[in-house]
Amino acid sequence: MVLIRVIANLLILQVSYAQKSSELVIGGDECDINEHPFLAFMYYSPRYFCGMTLINQEWVLTAAHCNRRFMRIHLGKHAGSVANYDEVVRYPKEKFICPNKKKNVITDKDIMLIRLDRPVKNSEHIAPLSLPSNPPSVGSVCRIMGWGAITTSEDTYPDVPHCANINLFNNTVCREAYNGLPAKTLCAGVLQGGIDTCGGDSGGPLICNGQFQGILSWGSDPCAEPRKPAFYTKVFDYLPWIQSIIAGNKTATCP
């Protein structure tokens, strides 16, 4: 079964807190507080959240399937139970989803660009992540991160974001896993399983060799299954659309 990695659970400040252990992201570690100044998360009701990535002082990227009418965007956050002095909340001023996206196919062109209602300032815990200058290479070591479930049963959620390293696979592995591979998509994971993104990590970044290469879209259910990588929207393939929208061409179509 395929899982779109949005969750419908308790508010992040109310979820069961997982003590630091070997079961994080799934299978990673607590992120260093200085590792993720670009990482944001959003509430779009009292019960749902997704990850996001700050790409400049006024714009964030996430998955299109995370879109809801009301969204509250948190930046500069680390521990849900402790406030950083520089954390801020923003709301969408404008939201852009590919106009040529297939309406009934959630995984098609699963990317959304959001303009914040007010720019943010760079600070100790807030700074953008640059868009990629080159596409990623198969075999690259990639970093995943988020506040999503840290157990495959999706009954434990963390107070802090967790990080893990996974590998970028070739298209053969991806097609074997799911009998196909959507266009402009990357797949990444660990062949033996045990390390993966999970529910609540949707929309968060895939960072390969230091570059923002993917946006988490979907994966296996349960998470972290052997030979069942997760799928990420390939950011590099959408650069012309992203740059056109930011430049003011609001009717730009996706490739």
From Swiss-Prot:
Active site per the UniProt annotation: H65 (charge relay system), D110 (charge relay system), S202 (charge relay system)
Residues spanning the signal sequence: 1-18
Keywords of this entry: Blood coagulation cascade activating toxin, Disulfide bond, Glycoprotein, Hemostasis impairing toxin, Hydrolase, Pharmaceutical, Protease, Secreted, Serine protease, Signal, Toxin, Zymogen
Entry-linked Pfam families: Trypsin (PF00089)
Residues cleaved off as propeptide: 19-24
Record-linked InterPro entries: Peptidase_S1_PA (IPR009003), Peptidase_S1_PA_chymotrypsin (IPR043504), Peptidase_S1A (IPR001314), Trypsin_dom (IPR001254), TRYPSIN_HIS (IPR018114), TRYPSIN_SER (IPR033116)
Main location: secreted
Domain of life: Eukaryota
Reaction catalyzed: Selective cleavage of Arg-|-Xaa bond in fibrinogen, to form fibrin, and release fibrinopeptide A. The specificity of further degradation of fibrinogen varies with species origin of the enzyme
Positions marked as site (Required for specificity): D196
Glycosylation positions in this chain: N170, N249
Domain Peptidase S1 positions: 25-247
Protein location: Secreted
GO molecular function: serine-type endopeptidase activity; toxin activity
EC number in record: 3.4.21.74
Gene3D superfamilies xref list: Trypsin-like serine proteases (2.40.10.10)
Intrachain disulfide bonds: C31-C163, C50-C66, C98-C254, C142-C208, C174-C187, C198-C223
Applied biotechnology: Is used for the investigation of the last phase of blood coagulation. Due to its heparin insensitivity it can detect fibrinogen polymerization disorders even in the presence of heparin.
Enzyme category, top tier: hydrolase
One BP term from GO: proteolysis
Subunit structure of this chain's protein: Monomer.
Summary of the function given for this chain in its UniProt record: Thrombin-like snake venom serine protease. Cleaves Arg-Gly bonds in fibrinogen alpha chains (FGA).
Family: Belongs to the peptidase S1 family. Snake venom subfamily.
Additional remark text: Negative results: does not cleave beta-chains of fibrinogen (FGB).
Protein name per Swiss-Prot or TrEMBL: Thrombin-like enzyme batroxobin
Organism: Bothrops atrox (Barba amarilla)
Lineage, top ranks: Eukaryota, Metazoa, Chordata, Craniata, Vertebrata
